[in-house]
Amino acid sequence: MEGWQRAFVLHSRPWSETSLMLDVFTEESGRVRLVAKGARSKRSTLKGALQPFTPLLLRFGGRGEVKTLRSAEAVSLALPLSGITLYSGLYINELLSRVLEYETRFSELFFDYLHCIQSLAGVTGTPEPALRRFELALLGHLGYGVNFTHCAGSGEPVDDTMTYRYREEKGFIASVVIDNKTFTGRQLKALNAREFPDADTLRAAKRFTRMALKPYLGGKPLKSRELFRQFMPKRTVKTHYE
């Protein structure tokens, strides 16, 4: 654990007059809680680097649940997120902080996270496709395996024009009833491909990921979502979060 690791800060808060408590996501150790001693002091060279969305190299150690940051280097400047992409980045940071256990390795998820924030930094339209792809990747890494391509009841490939009801721990079963737990075969194929060519498939992806993530998040509201509603225009909020 004393070697250098690629990492991102998910969240930070003051720990003392001169130190920070960091929640970081690392390539090799997963999510780790660190104390950055002296990082808040006026002479600290770390203060500017230990920010969300800045690619870092970290070295840390210690035996307890809270490790001690030994060294930190910024690999590059922070990825340029602002407005809706900033709130989207805060959202995925909060997701990781809420659902990942400490010190559980998720190397592939680390690169999914990196790809997501890079996509957000370069987005010119809605960030929702990038968010939905990351949520689906996260669910997969958590062991939430869902077959989007076949009916769980008959085993037959899904049909674009048919409707399927989602049942937890079983999958999608053909249904004649249409409600917020049903999806068309076309929507399921889009979820499987993680490609959302229109508003219909994008809305379906949001419905599914919200249902699937709910058991991991519990009833506690996401702070990033509340911040988004508070500071972004109502029309934007309705488009992206409702």
UniProtKB/Swiss-Prot annotation:
Keywords: DNA damage, DNA recombination, DNA repair. GO terms for biological process: DNA recombination; double-strand break repair; recombinational repair; response to UV. The keyword Secreted does not apply. Induction: Encoded in the rnc-era-recO operon. GO terms for cellular component: bacterial nucleoid. It comes from the Bacteria. Disruption phenotype: No visible phenotype. Transmembrane segments: none annotated. The keyword DNA repair applies. Monomer. Involved in DNA repair and RecF pathway recombination. Belongs to the RecO family. This is DNA repair protein RecO. It comes from Escherichia coli (strain K12).
